[in-house]
Amino acid sequence: AIELYNKPTIKYRVEGFSLFICNAWELMLKSYLIKSKGEKSIYFPDNPERTISLENAISKVFTNKKDPLRLNLEKILELRNISTHFITEEYEMVYVPLFQACILNYNEKMMAFHQVDMTKIIPQNFLTLSVSMKALDEAEIVAKYPEEIATKILTVKGAIDELSFQENDRFSIKIEHFHYLTKDKDKATSFVKIDS
């Protein structure tokens, strides 16, 4: 999921990321359920040939419905479920804070549930996503898309923003860039000059 997302030439990297990260979580959670509750715990009681869904695994492992980690997974799962029918490039700006938190949550739970340190497999600096610097512009979305699609994008963004205001890094990791002008070169992180 991380490798796919960080390739700039791939068009549907947001949708691809959601598919692969959900698959990784599903396998990890089912493995944990087998380890902690036995093999039968990942099968439906009325259909022992069929394994439970990711939604079921999430609710069995993370029982607190208000847990920011669970809310994070549920939002990414919603994206995975609609991304085959509803793809927009603006979703990157909406979901990337959730994706980054999801990666760190996955790393934490792999260690807690399976004693596997993902930073031994993937160097820690590669657990960071390459993100677009472009901000989501509501007026641009309304102008670009039909009303139904624009409303959907802005509604999803509003719901995620509302949950993000709780400032819990298990739900989302806010990515902000601030630029300040200073005359003190020791405080500067980059330099600009006026060229005539």
PLM feature segments, named:
Residues 2, 14-34:
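Short, hydrophobic, well-ordered secondary-structure elements
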Residues 1-17, 43, 126, 131:
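Charged alpha-helical initiation segments
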Residues 95-146:
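Amphipathic, Lys/Arg-enriched alpha-helical patches that create a basic surface
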Residues 22, 26, 74, 81, ...:
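Generic structural signal for well-ordered, non-transmembrane alpha-helical segments
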Residues 127-196:
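Long, charge-rich C-terminal accessory regions
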Residues 3-6, 29-34, 81, 85-89, ...:
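Charged/polar positions within long, soluble alpha-helices
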Residues 31-96:
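A broadly used, surface-exposed interaction patch
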